[in-house]
């Protein structure tokens, strides 16, 4: 992963101070601002937002909100037959594999899998992104509706668990990876504003190839890697099968068939 930039967290009011300290302590974030800050996190009425202070164009703060936008619509209108990710992970009407999302990001793919009925444990290596995701999950989980119920099947467990192999509440059937991949030319122009901010903060996963082996070791049945159609195989390793969509493909590394004994 690209070196983490310094991003301070601030409270919008005195009432938020205790909560801000708890977030900062959990994710190792500083309180002090500097004149060189590129990003700042602000907690306002319980909502954590990332502000890009030096953005080339005016951008709204980045917030993880599972009740808004295309993610909410997609989760509520997902059909197994239309979801390439479901086919790759192995979701059926009768079988909902447990999943570890080792590169959770803003939680969007994990949210789709949870909407399909999977229990998903999330790992996000960037502490600022993890803090945003954690805040979004906790807010959503308080709501007694489909979105809230979906988010209850999502659990953010930490930042480095894929490499330590610890902290999981259950052994995952599937490990899912979607490492950041450098975009160039036309691809950059097509990236939406919220993802522009995300990519500026996180950069590309320069060590992405190192994720595959621990993922294979952890998964009970398979590892699924999401890649742009033009991208090479992760770690140069050819998958057992592929599921392709318009812009992406899902490379599937199979250890054994579902329900097949490990012995």
From Swiss-Prot:
Localization annotation: Cytoplasm
Catalytic activity: guanosine(1516) in 16S rRNA + S-adenosyl-L-methionine = N(2)-methylguanosine(1516) in 16S rRNA + S-adenosyl-L-homocysteine + H(+)
Keywords recorded for this protein, A-Z: Cytoplasm, Methyltransferase, rRNA processing, S-adenosyl-L-methionine, Transferase
Described purpose of this protein according to its UniProt entry: Specifically methylates the guanosine in position 1516 of 16S rRNA.
Superkingdom field: Bacteria
InterPro entries (alphabetical): 16SrRNA_methylTrfase_J (IPR007536), SAM-dependent_MTases_sf (IPR029063)
Name of a matching Pfam family: SAM_MT
Record-listed S-adenosyl-L-methionine binding positions: 108-109, 124-125, 178
Lineage: Bacteria, Pseudomonadati, Pseudomonadota, Gammaproteobacteria, Alteromonadales
Protein name per the record: Ribosomal RNA small subunit methyltransferase J
Enzyme class at the top of the EC tree: transferase
GO molecular function: rRNA (guanine-N2-)-methyltransferase activity
Principal location class: cytoplasm
E.C. no: 2.1.1.242
């Amino acid at each position: 992963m690209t070196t983490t930039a310094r991003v301070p967290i601030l409270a919008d009011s005195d009432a938020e101070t205790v909560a801000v300290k708890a977030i900062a302590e959990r994710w190792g974030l500083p309180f002090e601002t500097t004149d060189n800050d590129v990003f700042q996190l602000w907690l306002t009425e319980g909502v954590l937002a990332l502000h890009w202070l030096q953005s080339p164009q005016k951008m709204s703060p980045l917030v993880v909100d599972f009740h808004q936008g295309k993610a909410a619509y997609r989760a509520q209108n997902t059909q197994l037959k239309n979801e390439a990710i479901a086919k790759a992970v192995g979701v059926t009407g009768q079988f909902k594999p447990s999943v570890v999302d080792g590169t959770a990001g803003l939680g969007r793919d994990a949210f789709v899998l949870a909407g399909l009925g999977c229990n998903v444990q999330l790992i996000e290596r960037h502490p600022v992104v993890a803090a945003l995701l954690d805040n979004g999950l906790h807010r959503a989980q308080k709501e007694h509706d489909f979105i809230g119920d979906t988010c209850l099947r999502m659990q953010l467990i930490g930042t480095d668990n894929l490499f330590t192999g610890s902290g999981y509440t259950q052994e995952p059937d599937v490990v899912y990876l979607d490492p950041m991949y450098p975009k160039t030319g036309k691809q950059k122009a097509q990236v939406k504003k919220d993802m522009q901010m995300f990519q500026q903060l996180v950069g590309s996963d320069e060590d992405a190839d190192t994720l595959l082996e621990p993922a294979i070791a952890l998964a009970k049945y398979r590892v699924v890697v999401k890649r742009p159609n033009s991208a090479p195989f992760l770690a140069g390793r050819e998958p057992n099968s592929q599921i392709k969509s318009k812009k992406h493909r899902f490379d599937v590394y199979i250890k054994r068939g579902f329900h097949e004994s490990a012995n």
